[in-house]
Amino acid sequence: MTVQHEIKSQLAKLLATEDILVEHKKVETAEFNVQTRVLTLPMWEKASNGVIDMLVGHEVGHALYTPNTEWWKEVQIPQQFVNVVEDARIEKLIKRRYEGLNKTFYNAYHELSDKDFFDIENKDMSDFNLADRVNFCLLYTSPSPRDSALSRMPSSA
């Protein structure tokens, strides 16, 4: 199914509750610049609408909840760890705000896992740096019994 860029742009603006600039480019991954308020979405050939919706939800989470400061420099926390924790934090918050995104995130991460998008199949986790291992742990852990929205991946992954 073809991704309709204008529809995804409007979705992002509606979820963000502001007139952010949405760009569709041939880039490796999605990103949101908290200073310029620009959301960049990748133009992946084989990305489903569900995966793009998840990327929109994730990046809008940054638009809504990531502060426009570099506070971690003052406390000397490596940025790779800040990124991992911030991604988990904003995903939890965006899914609380828009409860319908729970299923979108679940299905999209399941699809990415099935396609080995993260290129981890048949790899030894001990070869990855600590921040990546923490991120994969957050992605691949089963949901908490009290809050299924805490996990970003299906428990079967």
Please state what every model-predicted region is.
Residues 152-155:
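Hydrophobic alpha-helical segments, chiefly the membrane-spanning helices
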Residues 140-147:
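Conserved small/polar residues in nucleotide/adenosyl-binding loops
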Residues 1-126, 135-139:
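Basic/hydrophobic alpha-helical interface regions
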Residues 61, 147-150:
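Short hydrophobic/aromatic residue motifs in ordered secondary structure
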